[in-house]
C-alpha cells in the first residue's frame, strides 16, 4: 500500500510556481495578483482562505482579501466583481464558497470574467473542459489528477466510481477522467447501492463530506482510493474523511490520507491557475 502524499507533491509543484514567478520578476514584470472575496464569518471558509493567502505569499503571488458582512446585498457584490474584472492589475478572482443563502452562487460565479476565473467555474471554461480543450480547470479535480500522475497512475481504461456530484468536484472530475479514457460511474444520494459500484472499481473517489461512508467491505483488493472529504470527528475532534482509512488502507494499492492528501493539491492548483492567468495577462 502506497500513501498518495499530497503534501509532498504539492510542495514540489509550489516550488516550480515560485521559480516561474521569480523568472518574470527578474525580467521586471509585476507580481501575479489574486483577489479573494470572503463573505460572512464561516469558520471553515476563514481557514481555507487563510491557507490560500499563506500559500500565495510563499510563492510570490500578491493577494488581496476583500471581506464583506454576510448581509451584503447582491448589487454591492456585483459592483465589486465588476470592479475586479476591470482592474488590470488583478489576474485572478476567487469567490469563496459557500455564499450566504440570499445570494445566488451561480449568478456571481458567472459574473467573474472567464479571463480571471481562477476556480474554472465559468460556463466558458467548463465548456472548454467538456470539449477537451486546454483551459482553467477546477482546482480539486485537477489536483486529484495531478496527484495520480505524480505516482504514475494511468487512468486510461480504468473503471472509476465517483461518489458525490457537485459542480465543484464530482461533475468536472467525471468529465476530465472520461476525456482521459476512463470509464466513469457517478453515484449520488439517490444511488441504491454504493457497494455495487465501488466493489468493482479500480479507483474509488469519494467527495460527500460524510464521515466513513466508504468502508472496507466496499473496496476490492488493490483498488486506489481517493478521499476528498474533510470532516471533524465529533468524538475525537480530529480531521477525518469519507473513508474509514485505518481499515480500508490494507486493501488498497494507493490511498490518500486526510489530512495531507487532496487538500494540499487543491491549494497548489489554485497557485498554478493564478500563474496561468497571469501569463496570459502580461502577454496581452
Curated annotation (Swiss-Prot):
<feature type="binding site">
    <location>
        <begin position="164"/>
        <end position="166"/>
    </location>
    <ligand>
        <name>NADP(+)</name>
    </ligand>
</feature>
<keyword id="KW-0028">Amino-acid biosynthesis</keyword>
<keyword id="KW-0521">NADP</keyword>
<dbReference type="GO" id="GO:0035999">
    <property type="term" value="P:tetrahydrofolate interconversion"/>
</dbReference>
<dbReference type="InterPro" id="IPR036291">
    <property type="entry name" value="NAD(P)-bd_dom_sf"/>
</dbReference>
<dbReference type="GO" id="GO:0006164">
    <property type="term" value="P:purine nucleotide biosynthetic process"/>
</dbReference>
<dbReference type="GO" id="GO:0000105">
    <property type="term" value="P:L-histidine biosynthetic process"/>
</dbReference>
<keyword id="KW-0554">One-carbon metabolism</keyword>
<dbReference type="GO" id="GO:0004488">
    <property type="term" value="F:methylenetetrahydrofolate dehydrogenase (NADP+) activity"/>
</dbReference>
<dbReference type="InterPro" id="IPR046346">
    <property type="entry name" value="Aminoacid_DH-like_N_sf"/>
</dbReference>
<dbReference type="GO" id="GO:0009086">
    <property type="term" value="P:methionine biosynthetic process"/>
</dbReference>
<dbReference type="Pfam" id="PF02882">
    <property type="entry name" value="THF_DHG_CYH_C"/>
</dbReference>
<dbReference type="InterPro" id="IPR020631">
    <property type="entry name" value="THF_DH/CycHdrlase_NAD-bd_dom"/>
</dbReference>
<dbReference type="GO" id="GO:0005829">
    <property type="term" value="C:cytosol"/>
</dbReference>
<comment type="similarity">
    <text>Belongs to the tetrahydrofolate dehydrogenase/cyclohydrolase family.</text>
</comment>
<dbReference type="Pfam" id="PF00763">
    <property type="entry name" value="THF_DHG_CYH"/>
</dbReference>
<comment type="subunit">
    <text>Homodimer.</text>
</comment>
<dbReference type="InterPro" id="IPR020867">
    <property type="entry name" value="THF_DH/CycHdrlase_CS"/>
</dbReference>
<dbReference type="InterPro" id="IPR020630">
    <property type="entry name" value="THF_DH/CycHdrlase_cat_dom"/>
</dbReference>
<keyword id="KW-0378">Hydrolase</keyword>
<keyword id="KW-0511">Multifunctional enzyme</keyword>
<comment type="pathway">
    <text>One-carbon metabolism; tetrahydrofolate interconversion.</text>
</comment>
<keyword id="KW-0658">Purine biosynthesis</keyword>
<feature type="binding site">
    <location>
        <position position="230"/>
    </location>
    <ligand>
        <name>NADP(+)</name>
    </ligand>
</feature>
<dbReference type="GO" id="GO:0004477">
    <property type="term" value="F:methenyltetrahydrofolate cyclohydrolase activity"/>
</dbReference>
<comment type="function">
    <text>Catalyzes the oxidation of 5,10-methylenetetrahydrofolate to 5,10-methenyltetrahydrofolate and then the hydrolysis of 5,10-methenyltetrahydrofolate to 10-formyltetrahydrofolate.</text>
</comment>
<dbReference type="InterPro" id="IPR000672">
    <property type="entry name" value="THF_DH/CycHdrlase"/>
</dbReference>
<keyword id="KW-0486">Methionine biosynthesis</keyword>
<keyword id="KW-0560">Oxidoreductase</keyword>
<keyword id="KW-0368">Histidine biosynthesis</keyword>
<protein>
    <recommendedName>
        <fullName>Bifunctional protein FolD</fullName>
        <ecNumber>1.5.1.5</ecNumber>
        <ecNumber>3.5.4.9</ecNumber>
    </recommendedName>
</protein>
Amino acid at each position: 500500500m502506497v500513501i498518495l502524499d499530497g503534501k509532498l507533491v504539492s510542495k514540489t509543484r509550489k516550488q516550480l510556481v515560485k521559480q516561474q514567478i521569480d523568472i518574470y520578476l527578474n525580467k521586471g514584470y509585476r507580481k501575479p495578483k489574486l483577489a479573494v472575496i470572503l463573505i460572512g464569518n464561516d469558520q471553515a471558509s476563514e481557514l481555507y482562505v487563510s491557507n490560500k493567502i499563506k500559500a500565495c505569499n510563499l510563492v510570490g503571488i500578491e493577494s488581496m482579501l476583500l471581506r464583506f458582512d454576510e448581509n451584503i446585498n447582491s448589487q454591492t457584490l456585483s459592483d465589486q466583481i465588476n470592479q475586479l474584472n476591470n482592474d488590470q492589475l488583478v489576474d485572478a478572482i476567487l469567490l469563496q464558497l459557500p455564499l450566504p443563502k440570499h445570494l445566488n452562487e451561480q449568478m456571481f460565479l458567472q459574473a467573474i470574467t472567464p479571463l480571471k476565473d481562477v476556480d474554472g467555474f465559468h460556463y466558458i471554461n467548463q465548456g472548454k473542459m467538456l470539449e477537451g480543450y486546454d483551459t482553467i480547470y477546477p482546482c480539486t479535480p485537477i489536483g486529484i489528477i495531478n496527484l495520480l500522475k505524480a505516482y504514475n497512475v494511468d487512468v486510461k481504461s480504468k473503471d472509476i466510481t465517483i461518489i458525490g456530484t457537485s459542480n465543484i468536484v464530482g461533475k468536472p472530475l467525471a468529465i476530465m477522467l472520461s476525456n482521459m479514457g476512463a470509464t466513469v460511474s457517478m453515484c449520488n444520494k439517490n444511488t441504491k447501492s454504493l457497494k455495487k459500484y465501488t466493489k468493482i472499481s479500480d479507483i474509488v473517489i469519494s467527495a460527500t463530506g460524510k464521515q466513513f461512508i466508504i468502508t472496507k467491505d466496499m473496496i476490492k483488493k488493490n483498488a486506489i482510493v481517493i478521499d476528498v472529504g474533510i470532516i471533524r470527528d465529533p468524538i475525537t475532534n480530529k480531521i477525518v474523511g469519507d473513508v474509514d482509512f485505518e481499515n480500508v488502507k490494507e486493501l488498497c494499492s494507493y490511498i490518500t490520507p486526510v489530512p495531507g492528501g487532496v487538500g494540499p493539491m487543491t491549494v497548489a492548483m489554485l497557485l498554478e491557475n493564478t500563474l496561468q492567468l497571469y501569463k496570459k495577462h502580461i502577454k496581452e
